[in-house]
Amino acid sequence: MLKYLIVLLDDTSTPYCHYENPKTEYKLISLQDLRAAILLAMKENLMVQFVYPDYKLPQKYEEIIETTEHCKIMPVACCAGADIIIGDYWENPEGRKMDRDKIYVLRTKKEDFFSHYEKVGEMLIHVARLNIILTDVDTFTEADFDKYKSVLAELAFQLKDFCNEETIPQFNLLTDRMLLDSMNNCNAGWENITLAPNGKFYVCPAFYLSSDGYSIGDLENGLDIRNSQLYRMSHAPLCRHCDAYQCKRCIWLNRKMTLEVNTPSHEQCVTAHLERNASRDLLQEIP
């Protein structure tokens, strides 16, 4: 059942997951389509997530956006009023202060993560939640798995001291699994869909931005999701018996790596299980 509508406000809207955005030419969604998207969300009782580009929107757009309950996903370069802030670098050359009340998403390549993971503890002090997204998880090798396991163990050691405080930090790679008792995945195509600036619906932003992506309907004619059952957990034979509940189970990566939207790649499965194991070890260390 649909719960969320993700609206890309511009062709250059910030990527916030595993995918990249190769588009460089600004192209705003039309005001007509923006209004229609909000009306649809109201009718279907959907929470709207607006994904912003790296520039300030015209005032008229902001006025329309404020007519509905929503969440703002913004790049760190232009994040005034953001609920979720997206970054893609570990350094903070401009001296921006992190907001203790905001959620931060750090998109990073594996080598950068392996080199800078010691900064995670420092970041957790200053944010409400930190999500780290490995943008090249599909390239993991056996050596990378070993390194990832080691890094997660080091991070768990860092977090153990934090967990002795009154508030346990929220960090997707380690603390999510501790709090879950069922799958909590991306669920694109089932619990959320994306509206692109061209007025068409897509499973997620990656399907709009990829050269081999496909639409699943439009505002005028409604949704047309072929084999929609394949996006549901009930039709994911491997995942529905898994207990790595924090796994993103990225639908786009599934299709990219296995050609099946309901079948994750080896790389996704192994990294998710390493996170689950590290989370278990951390939980056992907490007094």
Predicted regions and their residues:
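Class I S-adenosyl-L-methionine
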Residues: 6-18, 56-57, 133, 170, ...
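Active-site pocket-lining/capping segments in soluble small-molecule metabolic enzymes
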Residues: 13-16, 76-80, 87, 106-108, ...
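Extracellular/mature segments of secreted proteins
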Residues: 6, 25-31, 196, 258-259, ...
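Radical SAM/AdoMet-radical enzyme domain recognition
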Residues: 32-143
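Flexible mid-to-C-terminal extensions adjoining Fe-S/redox cofactors in radical SAM and related proteins
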Residues: 208-287
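A C-terminal junction/extension of Radical SAM enzymes
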Residues: 129, 138-211
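Canonical Radical SAM [4Fe-4S] cluster-binding loop centered on the CxxxCxxC motif
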Residues: 1-36, 40-44, 249
